[in-house]
From Swiss-Prot:
One record GO biological process: cell division
Pfam families, A to Z: Mur_ligase_C, Mur_ligase_M, MurD-like_N
Keywords, alphabetical: ATP-binding, Cell cycle, Cell division, Cell shape, Cell wall biogenesis/degradation, Cytoplasm, Ligase, Nucleotide-binding, Peptidoglycan synthesis
Keyword Cell wall biogenesis/degradation belongs to the record: yes
Organism: Sodalis glossinidius (strain morsitans)
Name of the featured protein: UDP-N-acetylmuramoylalanine--D-glutamate ligase
InterPro entries tied to this protein: Mur-like_cat_sf (IPR036565), Mur_ligase_C (IPR004101), Mur_ligase_C_dom_sf (IPR036615), Mur_ligase_cen (IPR013221), MurD (IPR005762)
GO cellular component labels: cytoplasm
Family annotation (Gene3D superfamilies): Mur ligase, C-terminal domain, Mur-like, catalytic domain, NAD(P)-binding Rossmann-like Domain
Coiled coil: none
Cell inner membrane as UniProt keyword: no
Catalysed reactions listed for this entry: UDP-N-acetyl-alpha-D-muramoyl-L-alanine + D-glutamate + ATP = UDP-N-acetyl-alpha-D-muramoyl-L-alanyl-D-glutamate + ADP + phosphate + H(+)
Length: 438
């Protein structure tokens, strides 16, 4: 255990993660200072009264007086106040670094532009099916530090690029970068390679690296090495194969599971399952338990979720598709008898939308574009696009047009914060309207 007594610690950002950092440090004899750029951040009412706090801005002098800053992933390291503190020699870390210094059980670490929550939950359920005591959290569910409160045989962490930027001591038993596509480009002014560099930190000191055989950007900096196990739809140690008209999940040439046995739809979920199997095998989870867990896995809300079906029309909520790569994954292998009604829109985070263009061709695709970057998305295929201000307006138009055999897909390729408080609310609005107009 690291001794933090004597450190002058500042925590930036409250919420569940910030509170977990406060609790972690107080139990180790340190009362940190807390600051948040919001005047009423979530969790403020739970902050102990004796903890000094500064709200509404970053307190630059507190940062310069600190010996250790534990910052929220939401605050970029390029923020002038943080950059000044770093230049003055103040150590800057995040909650995952605090966790990594303390965790005694093996850690499986999962990142990627898309699919990381699904794979994290799959691996967690595989371990649970084997009877292991497992803690699942990080960028999903519980903050990582909260997981230390219960005895665990395995930790399964979803990690974002922002979290990895401030993590230096993680030694994962198995780690994966599922895929890399443009996301958060407003946070990475140097472009995709800067974003990738943050993701690849997950491999530092990892015992096993699970890489995407069809995405070279997921390879470690030095390329494919002895630590690497690969997965992919068409190739890899874990891949898909057609046999007798059915798709099978394979491991090194051995058939493991027929795709039709999975309860989650979409080709992208087959590859998510392959990545989870590669990780579980690397961790020594018994194969029978892993396969049983996959057969029972029902998927996560707002992730390619069938929320309504009536009169031959399916309505799928993929609101978590907050970037182009995630929407491409949803469209890949999608089978539609009639017309695909695709809802796109929101805050594109300075992303390039043009990779979507090949998926939008043909007379059986209709686009409905809304929100901050709706016009830019509509320009990808103007002859098939309907531009509206809001998701609700688009849904009511769709409701008047759909016919049996059609599929309505909300897979926005954009963040939700221009019009919604989060992607969950956006998905809930879609679901409510689907049941109303469908």
């Amino acid at each position: 255990m690291t001794d933090y007594r004597g450190e002058q610690v500042v925590i930036i950002g409250l919420g569940l993660t910030g509170l977990s950092c406060v609790d972690f440090l107080r139990r180790r004899g340190v009362t940190p200072r807390v600051m948040d750029t919001r005047f009423t951040p979530p969790g403020l009412e739970k902050l102990p009264a004796d903890v000094p706090r500064h709200l509404g801005s970053l307190h630059e002098q507190w940062l310069l007086d600190a010996t250790l800053i534990v910052t929220s992933p939401g605050v970029p390291l390029s923020h002038p106040a943080l950059a000044e503190a770093a230049a003055a020699g103040v150590a800057i870390i995040g909650d995952i670094e605090l966790f990594a210094r303390e965790a005694s059980a093996p850690v499986v670490a999962i990142t990627g532009s898309n699919g990381k929550s699904t794979v994290t939950c799959m691996v967690g359920e595989m371990a649970a099916a084997a009877g292991w005591q497992v803690g699942v959290g990080g960028n999903i569910g519980l903050p990582a530090l909260t997981l230390l409160d219960s005895p665990c045989q395995l930790y399964v962490l979803e990690l974002s690029s922002f979290q990895l930027e401030t993590t230096h001591s993680l030694k994962a038993a198995a780690a994966t970068v599922l895929n890399i596509s443009e996301d958060h480009m407003n946070r990475y002014p140097l472009g995709l390679q800067q974003y990738r560099a943050a993701k690849l930190k997950i491999y530092h000191d990892a015992a096993v690296c699970v890489v995407n055989a069809e995405d070279a950007l997921t390879l470690p900096v030095r390329g494919h090495d002895a630590r690497c196990i690969s997965f992919g739809a068409e190739r890899g140690d874990y891949c898909l194969r057609r046999h007798a008209g059915q798709t099978w999940l394979m491991a090194r040439g051995e058939p493991l599971l027929e795709g039709a046995e999975l309860r989650v739809g979409g080709r992208h979920n087959y590859t998510n399952a392959l990545a989870a199997l590669a990780l579980s095998d690397a961790l020594g989870i018994p194969s029978a338990a892993s396969l049983a867990a996959l057969r029972q896995f029902r998927g996560l809300t707002h992730r390619f979720e069938l929320v309504h079906e009536r009169r031959g029309v399916r309505w799928i909520n993929d609101s978590k598709a907050t970037n182009v790569g995630s929407t491409e994954a949803a469209l890949n292998g999608l089978e539609v008898v009639g017309t695909l009604h695709l809802l796109l829109g929101g805050d594109g985070k300075s992303a390039d939308f043009t990779p979507l263009t090949p998926w939008l061709q043909g007379d059986r695709v209709q686009l409905y574009c809304f929100g901050q970057d709706g016009a830019q998305l509509a320009s990808l295929c103007p002859e098939a696009a309907t531009l509206t201000e809001t998701l609700e307006q688009a849904m009511r138009i769709i409701g008047s047009r759909v016919r049996a055999g059609d599929l309505v897909l909300l897979s926005p390729a954009s963040a939700s914060l221009d019009q919604f408080s989060n992607f969950e609310v956006r998905g809930d609005v879609f679901t409510r309207l689907a049941r109303e107009v469908g």
